[in-house]
């Protein structure tokens, strides 16, 4: 497969010290990138001193790497975790490496996809995902 398109995942930033990718939290290093060596739990949950729920203070996209983007031209369905059937817009296939396992998006996460020829440049919500033999990631958007 010739992976030529681009996939980015949204980072949610909390207190300029932690980032959330999927359901995991990591500290931000001096370069502003996630430090995948130490994982934190429940940084984004809880309440502030006024009793308001903690929310991300900022968000940005980080490059996951190359991928293939396939539009759903046949109105195919994918089954979601809640049992619903969903007609997805795009199917994404991306190669995985050990480094990328910390950046797996989950249902509800936002990703940005960019086609090499510029025909697609969209921010979309992940509706479903799976991994194949720890070598490939498949997303339905």
Report residues per predicted region.
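Short, conserved turn/kink motifs that form compact alpha/beta structural patches or helix kinks used as
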Residues: 2, 6, 16-19, 25-141
């Amino acid at each position: 497969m010739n992976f030529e398109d681009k996939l980015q995942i949204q980072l949610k930033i909390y207190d300029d010290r932690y980032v959330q990718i999927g359901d995991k939290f990591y500290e931000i290093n001096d370069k502003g990138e996630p430090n995948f060596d130490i994982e934190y739990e429940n940084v984004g949950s809880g309440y502030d001193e006024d009793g308001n729920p903690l929310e991300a203070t900022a968000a940005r996209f980080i490059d996951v790497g190359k991928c293939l983007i396939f539009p759903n031209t046949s109105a195919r369905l994918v089954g979601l975790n809640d049992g619903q059937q969903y007609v997805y817009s795009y199917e994404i296939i991306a190669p995985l490496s050990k480094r990328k396992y910390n950046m797996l998006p989950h249902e509800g996460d936002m990703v940005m996809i960019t086609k090499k020829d510029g025909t697609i440049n969209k921010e979309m919500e992940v509706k479903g995902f799976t991994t194949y033999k720890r070598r490939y990631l498949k997303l339905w958007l």
